[in-house]
Amino acid sequence: MATYLQASSGPCSTIVPEITRRSANYHPNIWGDQFLKYNSFDLSKTDANTKEHFRQLKEEVKKMLVDAGPNQQLNLIDDIQRLGVAYQFEAEIDAALQRMNVIFQGNDDDLHTISLRFRLLRQHGYNVSSDVFRKFMDNNGKFKECLISDLRGVLSLYEATHFRVHGEDILEDALEFTTSHLERLKSHLKNPLAAQVIRALKCPIHKGLNRLEAKHYISIYQQEDDSHNKVLLNFAKLDFNLLQKMHQGELSHITRWWKELNFAKKLPFARDRVVECYFWILGVYFEPQYLIARRFLTKIIAMASVADDIYDVYGTLEELVILTDAIERWDMGALDQIPECMRVYHRALLDVYTEMEEEMAKTGRPSYRVHYAKEAYKELVRQYLAEAKWFQEDYDPTLEEYLPVALISGGYKMLATHSFVGMGDLATKEAFDWVSNNPLIVKASSVICRLSDDMVGHEVEHERGDVASAVECYMKQYGVTKQEVYIEFQKQISNAWKDMNQECLHPTTVTMPLLTVIFNMTRVINLLYDEEDGYTNSNTRTKDFITSVLIDPVQI
């Protein structure tokens, strides 16, 4: 375990001499002041020529979408969604899919068309039957081998299988069938199809982040010289770049706020990851109307990240009890017995919520929203404290003890509650009551978050001397190997995705935009915790993701 002796002076000094503090040796901020150079960008104040060009392109795309025949419309909707501009045509897409759901037959259509229609309808909450795929099976209940000659259809079927729910054996068989054939054939294909297959096997459409997938699909789409729609392509490029400028301006504001807090100096043991936090929340919602929501949620996840390090790495149990009590009471009193750096953190935390309360008052939103958010944050730090007690008392919890705590300390119930605060009239009091009661979709998201995090991070955390993860708990309790645990956890993650899919089928308890936000949070985890802890170790794959979405524009 790496440790150091905290000196008796400076921002993190305490009244207790020579307390041994742990250090996780996180790498420093890799971005510096890079994002401070960007100016605030208001889309409504785009120059007149660009605004008119954008309007004309949008009207042309809308006309094509409305006038298209059924199958052409299917493919156009798919392209619009994958190019990241579906938010511009929500009413038209909803109307088209509603008509398709009413007349969904599919008996005479090919594999690609049926698979695509199924995927788009499921994606928008329509509970269409997976029995439509039985026509592609032989008398033995297996998918016909002749289908592999239709690679486009096989790829479309593969993408459709990721919308399966519990009990859909036909889609389980379809996933196995398509995956095996695509894996076998991928090295023999030419671009752009090869790139699509490789991308799909790594990250199916259903699990991808909007901005990353849009940037990638723009590059794929423009390679399809014979089939791509130049108007749609130009519109998607312009839309991406305009949104990127807006996002750069937002990140500049966030970076300036973070720099003024000066946590890098005042809390040097904590991860300095505010850019990564913004990227995380950009994956939750990217649309212009959610600017305030992004700003608030980015600040909250940044504060939660620092709290995680205070509880995991820095604080003594006595200090953490005092800090937790102060957060529970939500006041600045009785903090003299903890280090100055914790007091700095606590003041900054309260300021974030005060800022949000002022924003709610300014926009005429009810104040109860921030109350729900505060309660969710209190619940989070209670679980941080429970884990800190396990560590400092050298206690190895059972899996049954670990999971109820760890599913909350993973932060996704807290984030789900906070994500609603800035979402306007969509987030009713009933919606806050619903999310606060930890519904199935939030539980499933938390399972994916916790198990993914533990699988990629448990070895480093074990070396650091942290409390046992779900991996160690399972290995010890059931006497199995690490690889066997991974297999079991992947099954649980797969089942959690099915739970989430089920919760998004009509009729839903809350509106689809609120469910989509929770789904998007899970998509971020799927990306960042795929091969490693891409948040903590952000100087590899995550750096490339952020560069692609927030620095490099699309070439017009």
UniProtKB/Swiss-Prot annotation:
Cofactor note: Binds 3 Mg(2+) or Mn(2+) ions per subunit.
CDD domains: Terpene_cyclase_plant_C1
One record GO biological process: green leaf volatile biosynthetic process
Cysteine disulfide partners in this protein: none
Free-text tissue specificity from the UniProt record: Expressed in stems and leaves and, at low levels, in rrots.
Cofactor: Mg(2+); Mn(2+)
Pathway involvement of the protein, from the record: Secondary metabolite biosynthesis; terpenoid biosynthesis
One Pfam family from the record: Terpene_synth
Highest taxon of the lineage: Eukaryota
Chain sites annotated for binding Mg(2+) 2: D308, D312
UniProt keyword terms in alphabetical order: Lyase, Magnesium, Metal-binding
Known EC number: 4.2.3.133
GO molecular function: alpha-copaene synthase activity; magnesium ion binding; terpene synthase activity
Amino acids binding Mg(2+) 1: D308, D312
Domain notes for this protein: The Asp-Asp-Xaa-Xaa-Asp/Glu (DDXXD/E) motif is important for the catalytic activity, presumably through binding to Mg(2+).
Protein's name according to its UniProt entry: Sesquiterpene synthase Cop
Species assigned in the record: Eleutherococcus trifoliatus
Gene expressing this chain: COP
